[in-house]
Amino acid sequence: MAIVKVTDADFDSKVESGVQLVDFWATWCGPCKMIAPVLEELAADYEGKADILKLDVDENPSTAAKYEVMSIPTLIVFKDGQPVDKVVGFQPKENLAEVLDKHL
């Protein structure tokens, strides 16, 4: 499955069941651009097991504030609607896979 862009309006419905890795990012963020290809690979590797979602913090400030996103990229793992893990900053694919695997 491809990466899905989410907004303040549809965020809750997209994370209500299953496991998702949500990338809180912005267009002007250099490390966010660096992590994009890593997330594309994870989306392919975890198809059918976990969804990879992206939320632009500039366009969707309410959700970013709700989850206390202070630095970007911030990646939060949700399981059945609840945040269960969080990493901040660029991470290699192996680190993100390890974080996801803990919650599958």
UniProtKB/Swiss-Prot annotation:
Disulfide bonds join 29-32. GO terms for biological process: cell redox homeostasis. CDD domains: TRX_family (cd02947). Keywords: Disulfide bond, Electron transport, Redox-active center, Transport. GO terms for cellular component: cytosol. It comes from the Bacteria. Residues 2-104 form the Thioredoxin domain. GO terms for molecular function: protein-disulfide reductase activity. It holds the Pfam family Thioredoxin. Belongs to the thioredoxin family. PANTHER family: GEO12009P1. Component of the thioredoxin-thioredoxin reductase system. Participates in various redox reactions through the reversible oxidation of its active center dithiol to a disulfide and catalyzes dithiol-disulfide exchange reactions. This is Thioredoxin. It comes from Staphylococcus aureus.
